[in-house]
Amino acid sequence: MASFHASDRPFDFERGCIIDFDLQTGLSKTIATSKRYLSQMRGMYQDKEAFDCELQKGDPVVYEFHELPIKEDPGDFAFGCSILNPGKVGDEYYFTKGHFHTILMTGEVYYCLKGHG
């Protein structure tokens, strides 16, 4: 992925860097969200009958996420935002499918901007 740094020079801890990530909304003005629909979550929920029943009603967006490009070096920090929509499949509330990092030592911090769970 492309670097969000202004240059390839080492990170300047005194000056920091600017990234396109709004800490109030968690969104980016330049990167479109990726959407995960219920049909893409097949096999993730325990109650298969409830899943099929919900899918027959429609194919809602379960969640969407912004993923900002980062340098893929050990210790770099990933920035992004997940928006989890309200909904249930059987007794389970909607959840994210998960992901993996190509560099295992990539840090992440999750925090809730609004809503409750």
Located regions from the model:
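Eukaryotic intrinsically disordered, low-complexity regions enriched in proline/serine/threonine/glycine
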Residues: M1-S39
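Active-site region of the double-stranded beta-helix
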Residues: L27-G117
